[in-house]
Amino acid sequence: MSSGGLLLLLGLLTLWAEVTPISGQDRPKKPGLCPPRPQKPCVKECKNDWSCPGQQKCCNYGCIDECRDPIFVN
């Protein structure tokens, strides 16, 4: 397969992974809690946990939605 074909396939797989399931069911949240609210201007960095890389969560702090490393409480 040519490198152009591989890039196209990778792009399509990436888009497919970001699409919400057609059934309308939300994916489960990732484990852990969001750390305390950061002191910074409003920013919308993510829509849900799955729009964040790795184990990061999409944390909502009022007008701020950003990807953050989770904290775990025993």
From Swiss-Prot:
Domain WAP: 27-71
Alphabetical list of SUPFAM superfamilies matching this protein: Elafin-like
Tissues and organs where the protein is expressed, per its UniProt entry: Expressed by the venom gland.
SMART domains xrefs: WAP
SS bond list: C34-C59, C42-C63, C46-C58, C52-C67
Compartments where found: Secreted
GO biological process: antibacterial humoral response; innate immune response; venom-mediated disruption of cell wall in another organism
GO cellular component: extracellular region; extracellular space
Assigned protein family: Belongs to the venom waprin family.
Function: Damages membranes of susceptible bacteria. Has antibacterial activity against the Gram-positive bacteria B.megaterium and S.warneri. After 45 minutes of treatment with this protein, B.megaterium have no visible pili and are smooth. Has no antibacterial activity against the Gram-positive bacteria B.thuringiensis, S.aureus, S.clavuligerus and B. anthracis, or the Gram-negative bacteria E.coli and A.tumefaciens. Has no hemolytic activity. Does not inhibit the proteinases elastase and cathepsin G. Is not toxic to mice.
Name under which the protein is recorded: Omwaprin-c
Protein's organism: Oxyuranus microlepidotus
